[in-house]
């Protein structure tokens, strides 16, 4: 996965839990599309309506903490977010995101140096560039790259088993 892209940054803080990403009361809605307007609503009610396809979330530490719910990465992906860059992730959220085809990147420094609305350039498995400064990215293991390239775990397994 050596993809390159640029995107507008939305900055979020530390400990953004799954109840903030998609509150419990909206989990009963029929589709992820129905849930999209309520994403991040406890923190920033207007945010879901402002995000455009290709935008990037830059967050602090422990992004995706709280209860395990597959709808959290699904709704982020449905909003059109290209990737989330955070200082760290809750482990279950990390795997749920990969399994749903949402790219997550860890970087300890970018959050403290980026401003909401900035544009950053991402070279997956290489670096992030912001205002001329490069931030290295650790490579993801090959098995996770394969899942992301397929669009998620179910699609990767279908491909592996010759069903697609």
Curated annotation (Swiss-Prot):
Which of UniProt's keywords are assigned here? Answer: Amino-acid biosynthesis, Branched-chain amino acid biosynthesis, Leucine biosynthesis, Lyase
Function of the protein: Catalyzes the isomerization between 2-isopropylmalate and 3-isopropylmalate, via the formation of 2-isopropylmaleate.
Catalysed reaction(s) here are: (2R,3S)-3-isopropylmalate = (2S)-2-isopropylmalate
This chain's protein is named 3-isopropylmalate dehydratase small subunit
NCBIfam families, per the entry: LEUD_arch
Q: Alphabetically, which GO biological process terms does the record hold?
A: L-leucine biosynthetic process
Q: What is its EC number?
A: 4.2.1.33
- The gene behind this protein is leuD
Which InterPro entries does the UniProt record give? Aconitase/3IPM_dehydase_swvl, AconitaseA/IPMdHydase_ssu_swvl, IPMI_Swivel, LeuD, LeuD_type2/HacB/DmdB
> Which organism was this protein described from?
Lachnospira eligens (strain ATCC 27750 / DSM 3376 / VPI C15-48 / C15-B4) (Eubacterium eligens)
GO molecular function annotations of the record:
3-isopropylmalate dehydratase activity
Q: Which Pfam families match?
A: Aconitase_C
Tell me how this protein assembles: Heterodimer of LeuC and LeuD.
Which family is this protein grouped under? Belongs to the LeuD family. LeuD type 2 subfamily.
């Amino acid at each position: 996965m050596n993809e390159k892209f640029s995107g507008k940054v939305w900055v979020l803080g530390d400990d953004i839990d799954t109840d903030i990403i998609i509150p419990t009361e909206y989990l009963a809605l029929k589709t992820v599309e129905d849930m999209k307007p309520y994403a991040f609503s406890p923190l920033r009610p207007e945010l879901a309506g402002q995000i455009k396809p290709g935008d990037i979330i830059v967050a602090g530490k422990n992004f995706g903490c709280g209860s395990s719910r597959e709808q959290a990465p699904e709704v982020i992906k449905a909003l059109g977010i290209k990737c989330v860059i955070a200082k760290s992730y809750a482990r279950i959220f990390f795997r749920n995101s990969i399994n749903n085809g949402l790219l997550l990147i860890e970087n300890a420094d970018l959050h403290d140096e980026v401003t909401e609305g900035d544009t950053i350039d991402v070279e997956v498995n290489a670096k992030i560039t912001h205002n001329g400064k490069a931030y290295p990215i650790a490579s993801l293991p090959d098995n996770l790259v394969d899942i992301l390239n397929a669009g998620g775990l179910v699609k990767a397994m279908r491909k592996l088993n010759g069903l697609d």
